[in-house]
Curated annotation (Swiss-Prot):
It comes from Chloroflexus aurantiacus (strain ATCC 29366 / DSM 635 / J-10-fl). This is K(+)-insensitive pyrophosphate-energized proton pump. The gene is hppA. Substrate binds at residues 208, 704. It is an enzyme of class 7 (translocase). Keywords: Calcium, Cell membrane, Hydrogen ion transport, Ion transport, Magnesium, Membrane, Metal-binding, Translocase, Transmembrane, Transmembrane helix, Transport. Its main location: membrane.
Amino acid sequence: MQDLNAVQSLAVWAVLVISLLGIGYAFFIRSQILAQDTGTPKMREVWGFIKTGANAYLSQQFRTISILIVILTFVLAASVFIIPPTTEAVERFGSKEAATIWVAIGRAVAFLMGSLFSYAVGFVGMNVAVEGNVRVAAAARKGYNPALQVAYKSGSVTGMLTVGLGLLGGTLIFMVFGIAAPDALLGFGFGGSLIALFMRVGGGIYTKAADVGADLVGKVEAGIPEDDPRNAAVIADLVGDNVGDCAGMAADVFESFEVTLVSALILGLVLGDAVVGTIGDGAYDLRFIIFPLVLRAIGVVASVIGNLFVTTDERKRNAMAAMNRGFYIAAGLAIAASAAATPVFMVNEATGEVDWRPFFATLSGVVLAIVLDKLTEYFTSTHFSPVKETSKASQTGSATNILSGLALGMESSVWAILVISASIFTSVLIYAGEPAATQFTAILYGVSLTGIGMLLLTGNTISMDSFGPISDNANGIGEMAGLDKNARNVMDDLDAVGNTTKAVTKGIAIGSAVIAAVALYGSYFTDVNKVLQQMINEGRQGIELLASINVAAPPVFIGLLIGGAVPFLFSALTIRAVSRAAAQIVNEVRRQFRIPGLMEGKVQPDYARAVQISTTAAQKELISLGLIAVMVPIIVGFTLGVEALGGFLAGIILTGQLMAVFQANAGGAWDNAKKYIEEGNFGGKHSEPHKAAVVGDTVGDPLKDTAGPALNPMIKVINLVALIIAPIVVTIEPGSPGVIIAMIICGAALVWAIWQSKRESEALKEIAQAPASAD
């Protein structure tokens, strides 16, 4: 770790130790969870079905994507011969030959590490959630606080593993590569983002195919309660909560956590180079890199302390207040510690002045997370007028319910983008006094710190999100196992709170994805200009640095239009996948309802068939949607040029954010409008307004849990691909034969991916046509 002073070196080692302690704390909590009671034999039987289905899904998913991960690992290692090491890498390792070897190894290992860490977060998080749900149901028989403790601690395992592994990866790469860290960090971010995309898409399709199928036949047609054991899709629905809301969400936020760190380190290095001497002179001010690492470590410690305050008593029975208390205590500690760290790590050694601007940029991120939290709650909670209006609209049928939800979702996306824009503008104001030569980079560095501040309490955020599916599963197990009324009341209350926490954390996940994408967008400019500057230094004529992108230029405008269209294509394909699989589930549940004795409870449904349908449908889409995310920026960049690729990224960020918020909040509002009616309003359960609300909820399910969340990792994957290929796009001749041939191949792969995603699965046909074991 060259060029670090004694305090900075000590800080980096402390950050490494804290990341390991965070991981250790996660496994300590896991051991506490596993020591809890698993309940009655009937509870363990239902739990066994869920556990088998969840593990089978993730195992099959790993087999599906592992081949692609291995191929991309070798591609990134070989990319060093196309994208040569940076001047920083040559300086760090002493020669171009040594740098080539180290960068090849670094890109491949970092990509593999990012992939494995992201998968580990999803797999372990889901595994602990599955282990926790039956124990929450068992604890509910003892009281409210015991059940709350088990549910929240089960989610805390995922939260602490997310922050521990994310911080560990970034710190290790910096310790090994130093000023050459960006050469490897992009691989780390790309690996995590790609796995998050697979987890989000696969988990979202799985969970909503089962959920939509179970609701349409069970609630609407047969009129039986949710989680009724006679419904053949009920186990697939419960499994889906784990693979979608636990594994998928954990990998998604892990990706944002590491990508904001990656962008902060890349921009911090550029800024640290610019403020000392001249750019490229080998002198760096590394405080801009150390500070983000220290902030992340502070967040880990604050999350651990905050978790200790999540408790309530049998008299108050307020889980939401307990979790909010833990979050706000952690936030207060994190802000205070960040302020205390600023005079230590952000001192200009030349002047002795403390630079408080990074702290204020970080603080704006914490504020942004809280504001988005409240904004999402306003548009999706039963306590506020938007959801009540959607419930009221159900009195005149499902059409007015759906129209009300659509309007609500559209309006909410406007307010969300205004809030995010305000946070970005805050960074502009904070760095308004920065010299013109470094102002652009400094502003974007501030945006990356806003993202770090927003995810400073990732441990608490993930804990609250995972609390939702864990309590939902526990409630389902309690329903199917026939637990007593007191235990059911406890689980009903925790389930209702869990629905709120899931909706709120979705808003934070979307906001963090956009902030991360904007920071990566800034990294795109700095990377392009580094290559252009190197070409100028080599004496190339007619080359200018990329100061801005001219939207009036036809190629840029075309790129902007294509970028704006991609989120719609992605959403269309994921929703269609849910629709196809849900149709198969509907047919299967209808068929099993006709089995003699099943509706009377004398015959057990064949749960495995619905699980198999959902699993097969989810795996079918993974590679094709992954190819779309990787191929489109490559085609745009090499066909239209580097400025057009910048316009393309701007279009992706804008419409991706609007679509993600619209779909998440509209779906959340439809869900809670149904629950508001089920509480006894506008006729209550089994009334005509309730049936209309169930239809609205069913329409909203794939929006809020599949298409909307899948846009988060898609935006970041596309931005990272653009960052990786930017040095080639700048230097290569667009019309050369090699480029034309490569674009034809990429275009063919893209067409195949879209066709593959749209066609009906032969495997699903075979499952539907196969004889059933329960007949």
